[in-house]
């Protein structure tokens, strides 16, 4: 479900995303709604422009937190050790797991993350991801993946967005 904040021009509107029916997450107006590339994605946004644009996806998900973090990290190879970080914070009704990874990204093409298809290596890529884990076991993912420069330039906005569920 996507709602729009009233009283702003369309260029300035922030989007409010429902997270597991427990809280709203406010998406920065600079993150532009985009066509979903997969049916399992609930919301997709474009961050940046042209070839430097990154992809922000949001969806409900299953599996454990540790398994999903391991899978996300496994999609990357190389990268500086100091850029590979995981932190956990409390945000509203969620335990929020933030994950940063850089390096060469193995992007699935055509099959989605669980169904195979061909893989394309994207050099100098980064991801900042968030797993919203609720006490009842529900999980919601937000992932920003793209050229490292774009992801790093928008990391603070992404983290603020994920923590907005606590406001």
Task: State where each predicted segment sits.
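Extracytoplasmic
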Residues: 20-22, 26-28, 38-42, 51-53, ...
């Amino acid at each position: 479900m996507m709602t729009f904040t009233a009283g702003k021009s369309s260029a300035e509107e922030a989007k409010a995303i429902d997270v597991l029916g427990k809280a709203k997450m406010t998406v920065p107006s600079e993150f532009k709604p985009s066509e979903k590339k997969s049916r399992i994605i609930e919301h997709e946004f474009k961050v940046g422009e042209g070839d430097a644009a990154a992809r922000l996806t949001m969806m409900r998900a299953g599996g454990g937190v540790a398994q999903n973090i391991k899978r996300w990290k496994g999609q990357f190879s190389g990268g500086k050790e100091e850029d590979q970080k995981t932190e956990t914070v409390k945000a509203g009704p969620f335990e929020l797991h933030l994950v940063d990874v850089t390096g060469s990204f193995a992007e699935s093409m055509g099959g989605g993350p669980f169904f195979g298809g061909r893989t394309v290596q994207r050099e100098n890529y980064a991801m900042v991801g968030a797993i919203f884990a609720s006490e009842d076991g529900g999980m919601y993912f937000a992932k920003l993946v793209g050229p490292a420069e774009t992801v790093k330039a928008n990391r603070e906005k992404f983290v603020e967005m994920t923590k907005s569920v606590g406001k």
